[in-house]
Structure formats: structure tokens, C-alpha cells
């Protein structure tokens, strides 16, 4: 073990500034990277000049320190302050906040295991580093967002969890109605969730308790979301006008939230849906015949732009829940929402951003707050404890791995 790696095991107690900070700073100033991993050290000691590959794990000093901490509550206040300074120093010298170690664990996972969760200064410092890194990455990429591990943040895959998707995936050509001339092949297994054009050409199947892509079994929507949708439906209309209430849901899926919105008795209930299989289901279930329902067929990027240009329809509540879209799409949606929402209206969405890991979920919670503030809007969250964690039977990949849900409620300040 190198001197740097040994130092961050916090071998002596109490943890004091004099015992750790000068030596840490000297090591980093000497040129040892703050991202120097145990895997790199092992490769060096074996004489492997190439070192570990990009696909290998990255057990950084931050991981080692997180593993070495005592259980939450066992650090004195003074020791906690020193540990924060150690974290600050590592970040100042370029430590990455989101590497995965030899157990495929994030530093945030290790802090949570020790009991340092939301509200604790050490955990919040890691979240702050994640927010800063992601916003900087967005600037470097010229506005394009690459979330967490380099994959796009997906609203598709329902939850927006970071996924390893191909850099590109060709989809079959579509006719003028948007239908595919052929089904995506097995090579396109992740393209369905990564690219909306591919998704819209992919056959869907309604099975008990879920809507999935027929061949790949990607979860588009599942009935474990019912309690979330019940809360969301009541939330977005709580500031409704007494005489007239207009609501918009973007993405019908299984129609869970639309059923709850109908119980709120809106004057007009707009539903934007682009997938032909879902539209066919809506027609069979009689949604087209409901006098208070307006179906907007097509991508929201097209239909909502026309509504905005028309300038006659404004909403008390807007909800967004689509498949195979990314956070970059949400940023585009925000531009439309501010023009379509009433002054006292409420916007919300299915919040699975980063929900494959608790720390990533908390990072994106902050990022949404910051992004909405640029529009003069506030984002407040209600925490919903999930009574029963989702099961993923008959679904290829989970899209939500946290034991609670942050329901966003966004409105003008």
C-alpha cells in the first residue's frame, strides 16, 4: 500500500488536522494523483506498464477513506471537520466523486453503509462534489449532459438511471406515420431505451402489472408506481382555478396518473402520447370518446410547440413521464413548460433521475433545483417511502433502486 493509500485509512485517532493534512498535501503536491487507485498501484508493483484498463475498477483514496471511517456517531465534531478537510483537499486535487471500487461500490454507497446519509456533513460534501462535477461537465460539453458514469441520463428506462448504452445505434427507417419498416434487432438491445426514434418503432406489450417492450422486456411502466402517481395527480392540481382546470400529461403508458387525474374532474385533460401501440390501447379503452379529454398524438416536442405558438391553452398542472428520453430532453421541455403553465400552476415529473444509486439520486435532486431556479421556479420535494420495493420479474433491468421517492413539485416563485 502506498503512503497516500495508507494515510487515508485514518490509522491514528483522534483524527487531527496536524496528523493528516500536512502529509496529505505534501503527497498530492509531489505529483501523486488524488485518483491514484489500488488497481494502478498493483499493476505498477507487478511491472505492468499498461496498467489497468478503463473497464477495471477504480478504488480511489476517497473509497479507502470512506471504508476506514468509524460508524456514524463515533466521530467527534472536531474529527468530522478534519475528515471534511481531507475530502476538500482530495477534491481540490482532482478526486473523482463517482468512481466504482473493487466491489462496484460508489464512495457514497460506502458512506451510507456506515450510517452517513442525507443531512450528514460528510455525505452532503460528496453530493456537493457530484453537483459541481456534473454542472462543469455540462459546460465542457457545450450544454450536452453526460451523467455520472459517462452515459446519458435517461428518463427512458423509465427511471432515468445511468445505463451503459451504445454510443450509437441505428434504428430501422420509419415511414411518414412514424411506423418502423422492421423490428429492432437483438443488436439494438439498449437502443430502445437510449433513442426515442427506435423506441417509437418498437413493439410494446401490456402484461399483468407492467408495460414492456415486447422483445427486450424493457420496463416502460409498472404498477408499483401507483402510489406515486396518486400523489402526483393531487399535487399538480392543488392550485387549480375553481371555475376551470386544465391539465396535461406527457406520456400515457399504462394510464395510471391519467386515471387519478380524471378523479380530479378537470375541465380539460390533455394527454400527449407518441407510441402507436399505446395510442391503440387508449382508443380501445375509450379515452378518445371522453368529452373532457384531448389526445395530442405525436412527440411532445412537436405537439406542445404548436400549443405554445397558438397561445390559447394554459395549464393548471403538467406531468411528464416518458420512455427513452434523457435529461437533455427535459431541459428542452422546461422551455415549453414555462410558457404553458399558469402563474400558479404546478409542473412535476416521474423522478427516477439517478435512482440506480442513492447518492446519484441526491445529486440530481439538487441539479433539478438549480436548473428550475434559472427559470424563476422553485422545486420542492416530498419524500415518499416505498412501502414495498419494486420487483423486476419479467423485466430485463431495474430502473429504480432506492427505498424512497422524491416527488418534485415545481412552480413559479
From Swiss-Prot:
Key words, A-Z: Cytoplasm, Methyltransferase, Nucleus, S-adenosyl-L-methionine, Transferase
Primary subcellular site in the record, as a coarse category: cytoplasm
Start-end of Low complexity biased regions: 162-182
Listed EC numbers: 2.1.1.-
GO MF annotation terms: protein arginine N5-methyltransferase activity
Superkingdom classification of source: Eukaryota
Classification via SUPFAM superfamilies: S-adenosyl-L-methionine-dependent methyltransferases
Domain RMT2 positions: 192-413
Region of interest (Disordered), residue spans: 148-187
Enzyme class name: transferase
GO cellular component, one term: cytoplasm
Annotated residues for binding of S-adenosyl-L-methionine: 199, 229, 252-257, 273-275, 300-301, 321
Biological processes annotated in GO: methylation
Location(s), subcellular: Cytoplasm; Nucleus
Job of this protein: S-adenosyl-L-methionine-dependent protein-arginine N-methyltransferase that methylates the delta-nitrogen atom of arginine residues to form N5-methylarginine (type IV) in target proteins. Monomethylates ribosomal protein L12.
Protein family membership: Belongs to the class I-like SAM-binding methyltransferase superfamily. RMT2 methyltransferase family.
Subunit (UniProt): Monomer.
Protein name, per record: Protein arginine N-methyltransferase 2
Species this chain originates from: Eremothecium gossypii (strain ATCC 10895 / CBS 109.51 / FGSC 9923 / NRRL Y-1056)
Originating gene: RMT2
Amino acid at each position: 500500500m502506498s503512503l497516500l493509500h495508507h494515510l487515508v485509512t485514518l490509522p491514528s485517532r483522534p483524527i487531527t488536522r496536524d496528523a493528516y493534512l500536512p502529509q496529505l498535501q505534501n503527497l498530492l503536491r509531489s505529483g501523486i494523483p488524488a485518483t491514484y487507485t489500488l488497481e494502478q498501484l498493483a499493476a505498477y508493483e507487478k511491472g505492468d506498464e499498461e496498467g489497468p484498463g478503463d473497464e477495471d475498477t477504480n478504488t480511489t483514496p476517497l473509497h479507502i477513506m470512506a471504508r476506514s471511517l468509524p460508524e456514524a456517531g463515533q466521530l467527534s465534531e472536531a474529527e468530522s471537520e478534519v475528515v471534511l478537510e481531507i475530502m476538500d483537499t482530495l477534491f481540490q486535487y482532482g478526486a473523482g466523486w463517482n468512481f466504482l471500487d473493487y466491489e462496484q461500490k460508489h464512495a457514497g454507497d460506502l458512506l451510507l453503509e456506515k450510517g452517513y446519509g442525507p443531512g450528514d456533513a460528510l455525505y452532503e460534501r460528496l453530493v456537493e462534489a457530484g453537483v459541481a462535477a456534473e454542472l462543469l461537465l455540462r459546460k465542457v460539453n457545450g450544454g450536452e449532459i453526460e451523467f455520472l458514469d459517462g452515459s446519458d441520463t435517461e428518463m427512458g428506462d423509465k427511471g432515468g438511471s445511468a445505463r451503459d448504452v451504445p454510443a450509437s445505434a441505428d434504428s430501422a427507417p420509419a415511414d411518414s406515420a412514424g411506423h418502423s419498416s422492421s423490428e429492432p434487432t437483438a443488436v439494438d438491445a439498449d437502443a430502445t431505451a437510449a433513442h426515442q426514434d427506435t423506441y417509437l418503432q418498437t413493439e410494446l406489450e401490456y402484461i399483468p402489472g407492467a408495460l414492456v417492450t415486447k422483445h427486450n422486456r424493457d420496463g416502460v411502466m409498472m404498477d408499483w408506481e401507483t402510489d406515486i402517481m396518486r400523489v402526483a395527480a393531487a399535487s399538480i392540481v392543488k392550485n387549480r382555478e375553481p371555475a376551470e382546470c386544465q391539465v396535461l400529461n406527457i406520456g400515457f403508458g399504462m394510464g395510471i396518473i391519467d386515471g387519478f387525474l380524471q378523479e380530479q374532474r378537470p375541465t380539460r385533460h390533455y394527454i400527449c402520447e407518441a407510441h402507436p401501440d399505446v395510442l391503440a390501447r387508449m382508443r380501445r379503452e375509450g379515452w378518445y370518446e371522453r368529452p373532457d379529454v384531448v389526445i395530442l398524438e405525436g412527440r411532445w416536442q412537436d405537439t406542445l410547440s404548436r400549443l405554445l405558438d397558438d397561445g390559447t391553452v394554459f395549464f393548471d398542472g403538467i406531468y411528464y413521464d416518458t420512455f427513452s428520453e434523457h435529461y437533455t430532453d427535459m431541459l428542452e421541455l422546461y422551455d415549453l413548460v414555462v410558457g404553458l403553465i399558469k402563474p400558479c400552476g404546478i409542473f412535476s415529473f416521474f423522478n427516477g433521475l439517478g435512482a440506480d444509486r442513492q447518492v446519484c439520486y441526491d445529486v440530481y435532486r439538487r441539479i433539478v433545483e438549480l436548473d428550475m431556479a434559472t427559470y424563476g421556479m422553485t422545486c420542492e420535494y416530498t419524500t415518499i417511502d416505498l412501502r414495498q420495493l419494486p420487483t423486476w420479474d419479467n423485466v430485463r433491468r431495474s430502473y429504480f433502486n432506492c427505498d424512497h421517492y422524491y416527488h418534485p413539485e415545481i412552480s413559479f416563485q
